């Protein structure tokens, strides 16, 4: 019993430190320094109701909205509990069929120019909330027509919602689909 007592004490001490104190300190610092990000970067509508997160993609299929990247999550699209890519390789027949179907669906909506890959391939997480400015641009005619808006007005809105690379060097320019669609709803519901 004397041999096991120090081991049990160490388990209890490290459980308290690693399972209680450390998470509480990190959460407290995050809440103080990055309050919005620490609570999930939620986006609210005009009434203040939380309708989504700037960090997790949401499905949009109506022609009056910009469409996000396809989701690769299981059970249902954009399932945050099942985040992950499809893990299908570029020569996998099922993957190729899925991409071909997505390309066809986009062409059926009138996209005749080059289709950006982020509109037909899921991200590694399967939950990416952003698309490239190019992916937004090819959707402008459809969205403008569905809302009865001038394409130039929609193009300016996309340009205004295009975020630069992080710190000027990391990643690519991107457009948050949820934020863009909310701005569209404010202009022309």
Swiss-Prot record:
An annotated GO cellular component: plasma membrane
A Gene Ontology molecular function term of the record: P-type potassium transmembrane transporter activity
Protein's UniProt keywords contain Electron transport: no
A Pfam cross-reference name: KdpC
Subunit field text: The system is composed of three essential subunits: KdpA, KdpB and KdpC.
PANTHER family: POTASSIUM-TRANSPORTING ATPASE C CHAIN, POTASSIUM-TRANSPORTING ATPASE KDPC SUBUNIT
Stated name of the protein: Potassium-transporting ATPase KdpC subunit
Originating species: Geobacter metallireducens (strain ATCC 53774 / DSM 7210 / GS-15)
Lineage: Bacteria, Pseudomonadati, Thermodesulfobacteriota, Desulfuromonadia, Geobacterales
